[in-house]
């Protein structure tokens, strides 16, 4: 009985509040304006939406026209600059790039602006042309004999193909001779990284050798203009020789360096024959290319004969370095144990 009395009292208090809430909701519904599609209020609201969309469309059209105009102006300026060509570029050179890298302005010893980007004034030198050209490593052990006769076998097809066209022969020789230094330097570099040890300067020495041989090629490209089939031959020979020397150096560095030593001996012989034909008048002694004059610090009136003399001296130095490197390995030592002959020209 007590719970029933309490329930009846609670109902008497709640009923008036529920009825008042319901009437308030009905009154609010009656006062709310109709939505779209429900009379004049909907039409007005739809008109406002249409006017807003139209304004936005006009703004987008104006912005699009403005962007199109600016793009057209930029294209016109670029076309004008392209038509003006080098003169415009010379008049307003780019001082620095986005990355802050500025083109260095160098000059030679006589104050003339340096025109070569492939080498710098401090990388030029005067080779020692008094070096002994007749040095020869006599093959005694098996590996030496393998290296010696491998090089001799490679000379046979070269003699047949080029005969006495020593300009093209030198070009082909330098495309091959520039490979060993790069391969050896690369493998020593990777070994230094793996073992956390220095190379004794041999990485730099071998890479300098590769760069020097490449400069020989750049020089003889100015002297002998290769034909299309000679360029194709260079592609084939370089591809085969690079992979063969790479595998050979992995298997036996002492054999690889000995092969290069004998290869340089053959290069000395080829350049000696080249000089004989120049002196005999069989090959015209043309003026030396400008790149050769600056690279080897030759006199202004230098000729092709002077170029061949300094290139032959370079090959003799490379012969000594590679035979020396092979001797180091034959004595059971690593190249890092013996200081490299840096700047040995």
UniProtKB/Swiss-Prot annotation:
Expression sites by tissue: Expressed in leaves and panicles.
Ranges that cross the membrane: 170-190, 232-252
GO biological process: alternative respiration
A molecular function GO annotation: metal ion binding
A cellular component term, taken from the record's GO annotations: mitochondrial inner membrane
Alphabetized UniProt keyword annotations: Disulfide bond, Electron transport, Iron, Membrane, Metal-binding, Mitochondrion, Mitochondrion inner membrane, Oxidoreductase, Respiratory chain, Transit peptide, Transmembrane, Transmembrane helix, Transport
Binding residue positions for Fe cation 2: 213, 264, 315, 318
Class of this enzyme: oxidoreductase
Transit peptide residues according to the UniProt entry: 1-50
Oligomer and partners: Homodimer; disulfide-linked.
Function: Catalyzes the cyanide-resistant oxidation of ubiquinol and the reduction of molecular oxygen to water, but does not translocate protons and consequently is not linked to oxidative phosphorylation. May increase respiration when the cytochrome respiratory pathway is restricted, or in response to low temperatures.
Similarity section: Belongs to the alternative oxidase family.
Protein name: Ubiquinol oxidase 1c, mitochondrial
Native organism: Oryza sativa subsp. japonica
């Amino acid at each position: 009985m007590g719970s029933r009395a309490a329930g009846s009292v609670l109902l008497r208090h709640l009923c008036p509040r529920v009825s008042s809430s319901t009437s308030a909701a009905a009154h609010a519904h009656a006062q709310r304006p109709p939505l779209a599609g429900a009379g004049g209020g909907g039409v007005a609201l739809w008109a406002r939406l249409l006017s807003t969309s139209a304004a936005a469309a006009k703004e987008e059209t104006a912005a699009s026209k403005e962007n199109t105009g600016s793009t057209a102006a930029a294209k016109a300026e670029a076309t004008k600059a392209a038509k003006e060509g080098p003169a415009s570029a010379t008049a307003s050179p780019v001082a620095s790039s986005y990355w802050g890298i500025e083109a260095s302005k160098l000059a030679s010893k006589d104050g003339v602006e340096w025109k070569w980007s492939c080498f710098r004034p401090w990388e030029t030198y005067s080779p020692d042309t008094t070096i002994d050209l007749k040095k020869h490593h006599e093959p005694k052990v098996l590996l030496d004999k393998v290296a010696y006769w491998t090089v001799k076998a490679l000379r046979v097809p070269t003699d047949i193909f080029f005969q006495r066209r020593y300009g093209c022969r030198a070009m082909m020789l330098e495309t091959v001779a520039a490979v060993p230094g790069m391969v050896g330097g690369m493998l020593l570099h990777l070994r230094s990284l793996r073992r956390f040890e220095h190379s004794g300067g041999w990485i730099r020495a071998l890479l300098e050798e590769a760069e020097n041989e490449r400069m020989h090629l750049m020089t003889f490209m100015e002297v002998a203009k290769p034909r299309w089939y000679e360029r194709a031959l260079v592609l084939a020979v370089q591809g085969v020789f690079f992979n063969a020397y790479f595998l050979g150096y992995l298997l036996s560095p002492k054999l690889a360096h000995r092969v290069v030593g004998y290869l340089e001996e053959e290069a000395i012989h080829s350049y000696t024959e080249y000089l004989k034909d120049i002196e005999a008048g069989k090959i015209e002694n043309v003026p030396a290319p400008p790149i050769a004059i600056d690279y080897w610090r030759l006199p202004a009136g230098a000729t092709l004969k002077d170029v061949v003399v300094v290139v032959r001296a370079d090959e003799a130095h490379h012969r000594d370095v590679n035979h020396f490197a092979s001797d180091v390995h034959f004595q059971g030592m690593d190249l890092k144990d013996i200081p490299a002959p840096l700047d040995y020209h």
